[in-house]
């Protein structure tokens, strides 16, 4: 490629590159790469590696080294800090002293990066198959719990020093790493639903304490958490809808009635909701027996489902409300028929809730 003279290299007052469409020969391209291990080229004619910055030696030594002056490079693009974290976690490489030294002091520069870009980078960090290692690196460099709220989702997930939160998040990230290792897809909506679940629970409890009914309270809690932690990002509508479904299914799993169970199992995102329930059971905040029951119900045939429902003990409190038969009726019904079809299942949420 040849250099285009009318394109400019533009930076802001803090040194962040705003526009950079100037390019040149291969040696200049190599100098613009982030790390030495990313600045190697293979020549298919001579079957040799062209290495301008000692990347091969660093790869063999398992060292992550920034090309150029690290502080300047971080100022040019603060997202390079997140790439340091991602590469170190994914490859298991150590950082050379010059690359590592400025990182903590540069973290506040990430506050100038658009929210949508930070969100995308966070998802990348957690979907490499090394989410737990990435989280440890983020803690190490002050990206989480360091006083600068770069990732509100992670701050909420780990906030308050709650052992229950940390256990649930750790299990969720372990599950994410396992899925990636098995070559299975990891939906961002499921991962985010896990990270923000306890935040939703806290707000749900607070809203119910104000006298709101459970399902409307949960919907309000979901909206509040999403606005506070996710914000205005691309694909917000689909992401919010998927997360909402997963969360709203959780209280419905507790109510196992014939119509309610069949309707829930038929939901398109039932499996995601069930996987979330299983994760909660593994963390000790939901019943393992309940998770087992739903697994059996989901996989069972009609007869097996009927048997499972028959084994369910009635929950405490009012379960069914029977309406009185109409005063004017054409003829008396046989015993047991008057209320046929007139029962309402108190466990079924109002229309539009959780569906």
Per-range role (PLM):
Residues 1-355:
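Catalytic cores of the polymerase beta-like nucleotidyltransferase superfamily
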């Amino acid at each position: 490629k040849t250099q285009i003279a009318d394109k400019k290299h533009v930076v802001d007052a803090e040194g962040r590159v705003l526009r950079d469409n100037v390019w040149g020969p291969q040696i200049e391209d190599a100098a613009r790469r982030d790390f030495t291990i990313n600045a190697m080229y293979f020549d298919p004619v001579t079957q040799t590696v062209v290495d301008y910055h000692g990347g091969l030696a660093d790869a063999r030594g398992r060292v992550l080294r920034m090309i150029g002056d690290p502080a300047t490079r971080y100022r040019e693009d603060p997202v390079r800090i997140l790439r340091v974290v991602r590469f170190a976690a994914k490859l298991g490489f150590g950082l050379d002293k010059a690359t590592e030294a400025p990182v903590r002091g540069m973290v506040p520069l990430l506050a100038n990066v658009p929210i949508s870009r930070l969100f995308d980078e966070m998802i990348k960090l957690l979907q490499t198959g090394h989410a737990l290692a990435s989280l440890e690196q983020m803690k190490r460099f002050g990206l989480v719990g360091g006083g600068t709220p770069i990732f509100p989702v992670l701050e909420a997930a780990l906030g308050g020093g709650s052992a229950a939160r940390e256990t649930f998040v750790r299990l969720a990230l372990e599950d994410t790493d396992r899925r990636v290792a098995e070559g299975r897809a990891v939906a961002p909506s499921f991962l985010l639903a896990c990270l923000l679940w306890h935040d939703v629970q806290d707000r749900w409890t607070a809203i119910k304490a104000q006298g709101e009914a459970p399902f409307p309270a949960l919907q309000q809690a979901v909206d509040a958490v999403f606005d506070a932690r996710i914000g205005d990002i691309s694909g917000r509508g689909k992401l919010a809808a998927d997360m909402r479904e997963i969360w709203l299914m959780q209280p419905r799993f507790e109510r196992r009635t014939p119509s309610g169970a069949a309707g829930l199992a038929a939901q398109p995102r039932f499996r995601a909701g069930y996987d979330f329930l299983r994760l909660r059971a593994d963390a000790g905040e939901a019943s393992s027996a309940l998770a087992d029951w739903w697994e059996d119900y989901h996989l069972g045939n009609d007869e097996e489902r009927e048997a499972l429902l028959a084994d369910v003990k009635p929950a405490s409190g009012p379960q069914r409300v029977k309406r009185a038969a109409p005063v004017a009726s054409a003829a008396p019904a046989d015993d047991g028929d008057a209320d046929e079809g007139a029962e309402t299942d108190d466990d079924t949420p109002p229309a539009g809730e959780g569906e």
